[in-house]
Each structure stands twice: as structure tokens, then as C-alpha cells.
A protein has these predicted regions:
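ABC-type nucleotide-binding domain
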Residues: 327-583
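Transmembrane helices of ABC transporter permease
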Residues: 13, 17-30, 41, 65, ...
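Short intracellular "coupling" helices and adjacent cytoplasmic loop segments at the cytosolic face
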Residues: 49-50, 85, 93-117, 121-123, ...
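An intracellular "coupling" helix at the cytosolic face of ABC transporter transmembrane type-1 domains
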Residues: 13-16, 104-105, 121-130, 134, ...
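Membrane-integrated ABC transporters
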Residues: 1-35, 39, 47-63, 72, ...
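Helix-loop-helix
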Residues: 50-57, 150-164, 234-308, 312-313
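Extended hydrophobic secondary-structure segments
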Residues: 20, 35, 39-42, 76, ...
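Hydrophobic/aromatic residues in alpha-helical transmembrane segments
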Residues: 35, 39, 76, 80, ...
Length: 583
């Protein structure tokens, strides 16, 4: 219940609408409670004597009460809808804001499809709990106690008959809830799996088409779809027992009341009108119990969703800004002091092991190594996307953990291995680097990244629509736009994570020439091609998470066997310094 309490705390801004809705339910119940008493007078006084005045008067009162109950019901719907939708919007916003604070380590705890489900399906469950569950939650106990009170006033002995049904109904409800509760967890997990399959298929739709794997993907989707159908069917199988079981008990109680009530009428201990009113109250009481059982099942499902939502809201970011942070990075110098790192405490071995490096400000550093050498892992520690497990990473002479996260990451520009662009225009995407950049600044960055070559051929230039995920440009064009976007940050440290692999060597040469002019920026270039790093001030060779060698192109070519092997496998040339290369 603590999960529900925590999640429902987001209803606080909508307490006025909530209280008005609850009050209107009370008023509606009062009007509905009056109607059977009016009907009793009509049956006992108006019908036997054929007194039309009594019939019209009591009938008019019943109609007025019914209309007023309808109006209060409609007003309730308005206020409840406003509270429920505001509550759902607040939940989604809180979850999304928390996601923006998550670090990579936090995101490792949740799958992307699960996070999507928690922000959509689970929030919708909570919305429905308020929008459709509030009325019966308030109405059922009010109708129950008011109905019991009115029935007791009419005939105390007859009231005992349907009071006997209460423990029976409670036992049925308890049994159903114990069965259904765990099944809702499985159902939501199945929704996660379905969303994951759909997301993966849509993301990789071009590969699916290229490899003609549509039938295979259909089979994979059918598997998770069947899993969801089976989980939903199992849940429904128990939840649906609620209505017929309660109806069976309810109708049995009504038959008993009719039999005993008929005897009371025959012995002049009760009138026909009183029995009619009594039956109305009995139906209201039993319906309220049925409503309450439905609300209980809804709350059981809401509890599952609340637990999943709370897990996101209470996830503590793995990285945090210190209490008294350094607000600016002095320069682009970088130091790794005996740094080791593993992605999780349970990992069997370190991804990086005892790395020690000094990179002066303004230097150009190439980083090479085989697949899995931890090149990307190394540079991710610089903007503090992860914290080192042991050792110290410094930028600008200060431990990265002493900086404000925003200040540190603003000072570090990363061109990712995977080129990420967003829906919108090219201008919108470039302004991620500098929201206030004018067209002249944007074009200057594009020229440095050689993106102007294709932008000038586009009719709309910077206003060209990128399409979803940048589908309207090629891989090489994406890379150049990503480079331009990062240059617009004017960072002190610039990291290229194999980010020129999709451009031709001539274009790469132009980009390297433009970057060479950025003498006050420290540049780290992760590359597979020797030509991308051979002019660097320093080349770092990583092997299995360890620094194998550090030196210039000439030094490594003369002294390091791994570098010599990489060089020999990629090119043939006349000079050991790499000049006169034939490609």
C-alpha cells in the first residue's frame, strides 16, 4: 500500500477537484436513498386509494430526485476527469524528468520497453483507478451503510437475512484477489516483452527487409503476443468470477427476502410498499458490495502499476553533483591515475584495468585497439557518464567528481559511434550544440565538418526536414552533421568515437585539417584506421582494457609489434613515417 500512497501523492495539486467529486458522490447517494422511501409512500398510500394527487406528488418528487442525482453524477464526471488526467500528466512528467536524470548505470537496471510501458500503460492504469474507480470507491461504502440503515429502519429482522451474505461475499473476494494479484505482475511483464519486440523490429526494419527476415520476425512477435494473451487470459479467468459469484449470492439473498417478506405481509407485520422499498435498499446494498469488489480488483492491478512506477521515481541516479561543485572547467587537460572500471559490482573482471595517462590541454590523441579493447569505455569516464571503480579521472586538473555534471559535460563534446539525429530540421539538430547560434555560425560549423558540401545541394538547406531519426540523409552525412553539432558546443575536450568511419578518406582528411585549427581544444580520436590518428601528438594503444603502448606514430611504428601489425594490415607504403601511402 506504500506504493499506492507514494504514487497518489501526485494527486495533491488536484485535491480541490477530487474533494468536489467525492462530495458530489455523497449528494448523489442521498438522492438515490430518498427514492425508495418515496416509492414506498406511493405504493402504500396512493395506489390502494387511487389518490392521483399522492401518486403525482410522490412521483414528481421521485423524478426530481432522479434528475438531481443525474446532474450530480455528470458534475462528478467532470471533476473526476480533470483530477484523473491531471494526475496522470503529473506522473508521466515526473517519470520523464527522472529518466533525464538517469545515468547509464541507472538505465542498465531497466529495459527501454519496460520504461515505455511504465510511462504509458502503467500510468493509464493509475488514471483509470481515479477516473473510473473513485466513484464506486466512495459510492459503495456510502450506499452500503445508508442502505443498511434504511433497511434496518424498515424491518430489522429481515435485514439479518442479507447480512448473512456479507462474510460469504468477503471470502469470495479474498480468494479472487489472492489469485489475481500475482497475475497482474506477469501481465505487465508480458506487455514489456511485446513493446520490446515491436520497438526492436521498427528500429531494425531496414535490416529485416534487407535480409528478408519478415517471416522470422512475425514468428518472434507471435511468441510474445501469445505470451501476453496467455497472461491476460489467466488474469481474466479469475477476475471474471467476481460478477457471477456475487450475483449468485445476491439473487439467493433476494429470494430469501421475498419469501420471508411475503410471510411478514401475510401476518400484517409489513406492507407491500415497505417490502418494495426494502428490496430496493437490498439491491442497492448488494450492488454496492459488487461495486466494491470491482474496485478492489482494480486496486489490485493499480498496486502492480504503482509499484512499477515508484521503482522509476525512487531510482537514485548513480552519479550526482557534489554539494559544493566546481562550476567551470579550466582547460582540456586530462589525467587518468591508476583507473580501473567495471560496469557492475558483480562483473567477474574489470573493463579497464590500472590505466594511467596524462594528456596535456590542446593535444590531439589517437586511441586504437581491437574490438573489445575498452576504447569507448575509457572516454566515457571523461564526461562522467560512468564513475571509475577505482583511481581518479581529472579534467582541467580537477577530479571529475568535483564538477557540476552540467559544467563538466558542457566542456566535453562527444561525437558518438552511433550517429543520433532527431526529428525536425537540420537547423533544429545543429542547435543542440548551441541553441542561440545564428545561420553564419551554423554554416561555419558545417564547413568545418564538410557538411556544407551536401547541404548546399539541398533546396531547403538548413531547413531540410530530417525525418524520423534522420532517415532523409545518408550515414556519412549523419556523421558530418553530428560533428558540426558537437563543434557548436565549443568544448574544451572533443571526443570522436570512431565517428568518421562512414566518410571517405578525402573528406576525413578535410575534417582533420579543420580540427587541427582548434589548437585550444583537446582532441581524442578513437579510430580503426591508422590514417585517422597517425598525425596525432600521441597515440594510445589499448589491449584488453589495459594501456599497451603510448607514443607518436614514428615511435610506435619503430618499436611496437601490435602497431606494426595494424599498420601493415591496413596499408602499404614507402616510408616508415606513413608518407607516400598508396591506398
Amino acid at each position: 500500500m506504500q506504493d499506492l500512497k507514494h504514487v497518489f501523492s501526485y494527486l495533491k495539486p488536484y485535491r480541490r477537484d477530487l474533494f468536489l467529486a467525492v462530495g458530489l458522490v455523497f449528494v448523489e447517494c442521498i438522492f438515490e436513498m430518498v427514492i425508495p422511501m418515496l416509492m414506498s409512500d406511493l405504493v402504500d398510500q396512493g395506489v390502494p386509494s387511487h389518490d392521483m394527487q399522492v401518486i403525482m406528488l410522490q412521483g414528481s418528487k421521485m423524478i426530481i430526485c432522479a434528475v438531481l442525482a443525474l446532474i450530480t453524477g455528470l458534475l462528478y464526471a467532470r471533476f473526476a476527469a480533470r483530477a484523473a488526467n491531471g494526475f496522470a500528466a503529473a506522473l508521466r512528467e515526473a517519470e520523464y524528468r527522472m529518466l533525464q536524470q538517469f545515468d547509464f548505470a541507472n538505465l542498465d537496471h531497466f529495459s527501454t520497453p519496460s520504461l515505455v510501458t511504465r510511462m504509458t500503460t502503467d500510468v493509464t492504469v493509475m488514471l483509470n483507478a481515479v477516473a473510473t474507480g473513485l466513484r464506486p470507491l466512495v459510492r459503495s461504502p456510502v450506499m452500503l451503510f445508508m442502505g443498511l440503515g434504511m433497511a434496518f429502519l424498515l424491518n430489522a429482522k429481515l435485514t439479518i437475512v442479507f447480512l448473512i451474505t456479507t462474510p460469504i461475499l468477503a471470502a469470495i473476494l479474498a480468494w479472487i484477489v489472492t489469485k489475481v494479484g500475482p497475475l497482474y505482475d506477469r501481465q505487465q511483464t508480458a506487455v514489456d516483452h511485446l513493446n520490446g519486440r515491436v520497438q526492436e523490429a521498427l528500429t531494425a526494419i531496414r535490416a529485416i527487409k534487407a535480409f528478408v527476415r519478415g517471416d522470422y520476425e512475425n514468428e518472434q512477435f507471435e511468441t510474445v503476443n501469445d505470451e501476453l494473451a496467455a497472461a491476460s487470459t489467466n488474469t481474466f479467468r479469475y477476475a471474471v468470477l467476481n460478477l457471477p459469484a456475487f450475483q449468485a449470492v445476491m439473487y439467493t439473498a433476494i429470494v430469501c427476502i421475498m419469501w420471508y417478506g411475503g410471510n411478514f405481509i401475510l401476518t400484517d407485520r409489513m406492507t407491500v410498499g415497505e417490502l418494495t422499498a426494502f428490496l430496493s435498499y437490498v439491491l442497492q446494498v448488494l450492488n454496492s458490495v459488487m461495486m466494491f469488489s470491482g474496485v478492489f480488483l482494480q486496486l489490485t492491478r493499480s498496486l502492480t502499476s504503482a509499484r512499477r512506477i515508484r521503482a522509476v521515481l525512487e531510482e537514485q541516479p548513480a552519479l550526482a553533483t557534489p554539494a559544493d561543485p566546481i562550476a567551470a572547467v579550466a582547460d582540456g587537460s586530462i589525467d587518468f591515475a591508476d583507473v580501473s572500471f567495471k560496469y557492475s559490482a558483480a562483473a567477474a573482471r574489470d573493463a579497464l584495468s590500472h590505466v594511467t595517462l596524462h594528456i596535456p590541454a590542446g593535444a590531439t590523441v589517437g586511441i586504437i585497439g581491437g574490438t573489445g579493447a575498452a576504447k569507448t569505455t575509457l572516454v566515457q569516464l571523461i564526461p562522467r557518464l560512468y564513475d571509475a571503480t577505482s583511481g581518479t579521472v581529472k579534467v582541467g586538473g580537477q577530479d571529475v567528481r568535483r564538477y557540476s555534471l552540467a559544467a563538466l559535460r558542457d566542456a566535453v563534446g562527444i561525437v558518438l559511434q552511433k550517429n543520433l539525429l532527431f526529428s525536425g530540421t537540420i537547423r533544429d539538430n545543429l542547435r543542440w550544440g548551441d541553441p542561440n547560434a545564428d545561420d553564419e555560425t551554423l554554416w561555419a560549423a558545417c564547413r568545418a565538418a564538410c557538411a556544407d558540401e551536401f547541404l548546399e545541394r539541398m533546396p531547403d538547406g538548413l531547413d531540410t526536414d530530417m525525418g524520423q531519426g534522420g532517415v532523409n540523409v545518408s550515414g556519412g552525412q549523419k556523421q558530418r552533421l553530428c560533428i558540426a553539432r558537437t563543434l557548436l558546443k565549443h568544448p574544451k575536450v572533443l571526443i570522436f568515437d570512431d565517428s568518421t568511419s562512414a566518410v571517405d578518406t578525402a573528406t576525413e582528411g578535410k575534417i582533420r585539417h579543420a580540427l587541427a585549427a582548434l589548437t585550444d581544444v583537446t582532441k581524442l580520436i578513437i579510430a580503426q584506421r591508422i590514417t585517422s590518428v597517425m598525425d596525432a601528438d600521441m597515440i594510445v594503444i589499448l589491449d584488453d582494457g589495459k594501456v599497451h603502448a603510448v607514443g607518436t606514430h614514428k615511435e610506435l611504428l619503430a618499436n611496437d609489434t601490435i602497431y606494426q601489425e595494424i599498420y601493415a594490415s591496413q596499408m602499404k607504403g614507402d616510408d616508415a613515417d606513413g608518407k607516400g601511402i598508396q591506398r
